[in-house]
Amino acid sequence: MDFPLANLFFVPSEDATAFGRRLRAAAQQAPIVFDTAFGMPILLRKSHITTAYRDTATFSTRMFQAGILNGGLAAMQGDEHARMRRVYNMFFLPRAVSQYEERFVRPISEQVVDRLAGKPRVDLLEDFAMELPRRVIGELFGFPAEKLHETDERVRAMLRGLVRMHDPAAVAESQRAYGETLGLITEVVERESRDTSDTLLGEILRTLKAEHMDTIEASRQIVLSLILGGYETTSWLVANTIHALLAHPDTLARVRQDPSLLPAAIEEGMRWCPSSFGVLRMVERDVRLDDQALSAGTVVCLAGIAGNYDETAYPSPEVYDIDRKPLPAANVFGGGAHFCVGAPLARMEARVGLQALLARFPGLRAVPEERPSFMYGAKDSVAHGPDKLPVLLH
């Protein structure tokens, strides 16, 4: 393999569109590049990525079997994955998501917004975009409130080890954080198994029992998988959508006046300023994609978000336009058999939280002299987003 070298990810910019435009520019030069900072080949061409999503025998997630996700949904293949995926899907059916909205997300959103009231100025990244998913995860799984912030840091450490698997220090830190988090997960699972509640964790235990899979290990793996996906995905989705709206006051005014536009604002936000870098796959056999050769055993990144700035799909892609028809494809959730199972919850959480925020603070606006900087790896995460979101509330 001899691909052009690139540095696509760890590049800060005050322009929220720089990441997407940089990936698109790279895709126009070569279908596959080797990112020197990321340490792996990056697939940029849509046809190659579609092939990789569909051909799970050639492009697998088997590399996760060697780490903290071993035994979890992300590491499973074939029939085993299909069976467990069916179990996971039960937790995110429309009826279930609607119940989470009314019982957890809506009241928590109001509580988080209440805590902002009376402050003339806040950082919506820390005080809202991070706080909302943190609180929701805590309630859904019954985590003690005093454990939420340290769990947040451990989740980031675990994710860094999963994504930067070529970095021994990141992997070691991930394993340490995993051991600490596993103790907390075991504690809440054992407590819930003695007295099953109406939380998501209670629903998980009841479902596993009905499927004759009710073991502590199965429960722990599901909780771990959902925590790893639930924190970062939603936090950065919310943060990037907030920035998109603040940067476009006319659109912000429209959405505030008509909250039914929020789903479009969120979907376009995921295109305009994507939080995800892509997804990882392991090449199981020597394969050629057109004239590009990939060797068995290579871990690659499928950067589907390179298509977010494809002018043929999205005219004037640098423009944040919530009236695009059809709505942009949400590449941040991956694709194929391993498409993010919690996407309905993340979308709902963003919609409900943003609606509460905009309704409470009609004077919400950015602090003009403090522009956030955007980068993949913001705040030591594995996401693309801002380092801050300073706003005036009134």
Curated annotation (Swiss-Prot):
One Pfam family per UniProt: p450
Cofactor requirement: heme b
Binding residues for heme b: 81, 85, 281, 335, 338, 340
Stored InterPro entries: Cyt_P450, Cyt_P450_B, Cyt_P450_CS, Cyt_P450_sf
Phenotype for residue 276 to I: Affects the regioselectivity of substrate hydroxylation. Produces mainly 17alpha-hydroxyprogesterone with progesterone as substrate
Record's description of how this protein is used: The production of regio- and stereoselectively hydroxylated steroids is of high chemical/pharmaceutical interest. Mutagenesis can change the selectivity of cytochrome P450-mediated steroid hydroxylation, providing the basis for further experiments to engineer the biocatalyst toward novel steroid hydroxylation positions.
Enzyme Commission numbers on file: 1.14.15.19
Organism domain of life: Bacteria
GO molecular function, one term: iron ion binding
Catalytic activity reported: testosterone + 2 reduced [2Fe-2S]-[ferredoxin] + O2 + 2 H(+) = 1alpha-hydroxytestosterone + 2 oxidized [2Fe-2S]-[ferredoxin] + H2O; androst-4-ene-3,17-dione + 2 reduced [2Fe-2S]-[ferredoxin] + O2 + 2 H(+) = 1alpha-hydroxyandrost-4-ene-3,17-dione + 2 oxidized [2Fe-2S]-[ferredoxin] + H2O
Keyword match Metal-binding: yes
Record-linked PROSITE patterns: CYTOCHROME_P450
Keyword Acetylation: no
Keywords: Heme, Iron, Metal-binding, Monooxygenase, Oxidoreductase
Family stated for the protein in its record: Belongs to the cytochrome P450 family.
Function comment: Hydroxylase that can catalyze the in vitro conversion of the sesquiterpenoid nootkatone, a natural organic compound produced by some plants, to at least five hydrophilic products. The native ferredoxin reductase FdR_B and either Fdx2 or Fdx8 ferredoxins can act as the redox partners for the conversion of nootkatone.
Name of the molecule in the record: C-19 steroid 1alpha-hydroxylase
Organism, scientific name: Sorangium cellulosum (strain So ce56) (Polyangium cellulosum (strain So ce56))
